[in-house]
Amino acid sequence: MFIFIMNQLFCDKKDGKMNKDFSALNKMMQDNLKKQTTFSDGIKNLLQLRNNLMEEIDLIFQTTSQEDFFALPFPKSKGNTNATIAWSIYHIFRIEDIVCNSVINNKTQIFFENDFQNRMNSSIISTGNELSNEQMIEFSKVLNIQELYNYAKLVKENSEKMMLELSFEQTKSKIPEEKKEYLRTLKVADDWLIDYWCGKNIRGLLQMPFSRHWIMHVEACLKIKGKLHLKK
């Protein structure tokens, strides 16, 4: 059964069906969010996209060995595959936690509120963008994978609660300029990333990082896993 699941997983990725499905739902969601009359459909499609992607993340956790979580099979890649699976999943949800709670809202990040730095045994509190390949591997080796999964689930749940409470008018709101300085004091993201987030309105943030960012890194994880699978 395990072999069948793995073969099916990698066949789907190879023929591009999954990319196409994610892309279509993502485009529909983006179009829906632009109009008040279709806004609620946009939120539904966003939640559906995230659930579909979370199913892939769940499968990764269920079928990946501890060693494969910190493997780096594409060290020369210039794209998102130049990463470990552990780092990629941490990165997805760390960014989402920061954006949901510190950029859009004025709340304590789940990472800090629930002591996930200690629970995950994380050597960093940031998004991880600053790590070299060697640092990324070392970071991933000591990360508590079960607590990483717990963090991902809590962040997803928290973000989706916010999404369901948003109105169409609220999504037009720009991030206040003064938020930049506050975010810098947290020391959780590079300046260029803070500038990027604060240059968006809430609708723009729903599109990235709450959806497209997931697609980019989940698909990278699946390619990493596929490469590791072929080596065995």
Identify the residue ranges that each predicted region occupies.
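Hydrophobic faces of stable alpha-helices that mediate helix-helix packing
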Residues: M54, D58, A152-K156, W214, ...
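Short, contiguous alpha-helical
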Residues: F2-M28, F70-E130, E157-E160, E177-K232
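Short glycine/proline-rich turn/loop motifs
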Residues: T37-T38, S132-V142, L193-I202
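Extended intrinsically disordered or low-complexity regions, especially N/C-terminal cytosolic tails and loops
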Residues: F2-D68
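A structural signal for alpha-helical segments
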Residues: D41, N45, K76, N80-A83, ...
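Acidic/histidine-rich alpha-helical segments that form the ligand environment
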Residues: S123-K174, L205-S211
